[in-house]
């Protein structure tokens, strides 16, 4: 098995033994369920785009909470040096931690599938294609936010600070697509391309655009590599 996948499997299993993980899952699902109850079920609306948009907003807090301890916790406990001396490349370690956190996100999204099922049961009706692309878009956006969270966690041993850094960076790329009323249209047309909303919107409309897939993949790779470079530079400083 690929070393990164082995690391991911171990990290994912450990996360599922933590009460904190289930608390975070519960808060996210409760918030999402409340939105579904107030919109789709209460108003009889079959379109889940509004719910997906709210879930995207919740990611700003949910994903940093999942990732804040991925590296920062090990640094604070003094086990990071031990991990980095294992017969694994730093890239395998970082990608393993990323995949584990992304796996947690996929797990909670799988649990949230109960909401479109409830909408269908109560007779509102849903579009399976739009549900599929909506969840695919959330997974792609979630990958980018997860990579940002891993990078933030690599910067410090303080988990709260890692959460704040991840939240701040994520909020910036989230808000770039929502500045239309504050800046000139020509400037906004350029800036909004770097916002997650711009690329998630196609998925929520039921369209899979390879350009959006590439953008999310690029953001994910950039921040995972930044986390790797951060750990490499730290190791070099310690060797000196």
Residue ranges and their predicted role:
Residues 1-21:
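Aromatic- and glycine-rich beta-strand/loop motifs that create alpha-glucan
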Residues 17-38, 54-63, 168-172, 222:
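Hydrophobic alpha-helical transmembrane segments of multi-pass membrane transport/permease proteins
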Residues 35-37, 43, 58, 100-160:
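Secretory targeting signals
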Residues 47-50, 66-84, 98:
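Transmembrane helix boundary and interhelical loop/hinge segments in multi-pass membrane proteins
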Residues 53-73, 108:
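Long, hydrophobic alpha-helical segments
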Residues 63-67, 115, 147-148, 226-227:
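Hydrophobic/aromatic residues in alpha-helical transmembrane segments
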Residues 162-236:
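Terminal transmembrane helical anchor/hairpin motif
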């Amino acid at each position: 098995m690929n070393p990164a996948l082995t690391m991911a499997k171990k990290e994912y299993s450990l996360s599922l033994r933590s009460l904190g993980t289930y608390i975070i899952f519960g808060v996210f699902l409760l918030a999402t369920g409340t939105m579904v109850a107030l919109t789709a079920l209460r108003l009889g609306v079959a379109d889940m785009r509004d719910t997906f948009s709210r879930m995207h907003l919740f990611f700003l807090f949910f994903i940093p909470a999942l990732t804040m301890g991925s590296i920062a916790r090990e640094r604070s406990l003094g086990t990071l040096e031990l991990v980095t001396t294992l017969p694994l490349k730093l890239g395998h370690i970082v990608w393993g931690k990323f995949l584990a956190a992304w796996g947690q996100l996929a797990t909670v999204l799988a649990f949230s599938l109960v909401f479109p099922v409830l909408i269908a049961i109560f007779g509102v009706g849903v579009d399976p294609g739009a549900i599929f692309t909506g969840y695919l878009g959330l997974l792609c956006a979630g990958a980018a936010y997860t990579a940002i969270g891993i990078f933030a966690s690599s910067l410090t041993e303080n988990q709260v600070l890692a959460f704040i850094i991840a939240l701040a960076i994520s909020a910036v790329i989230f808000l770039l697509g929502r500045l239309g009323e504050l800046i000139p249209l020509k400037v906004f047309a350029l800036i909004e391309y770097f916002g997650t909303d711009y690329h998630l919107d196609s998925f929520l409309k039921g369209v899979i655009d390879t350009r959006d897939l590439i953008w999310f993949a690029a953001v994910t790779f950039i921040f995972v590599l930044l986390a790797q470079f951060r750990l490499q530079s730290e190791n070099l400083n310690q060797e000196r």
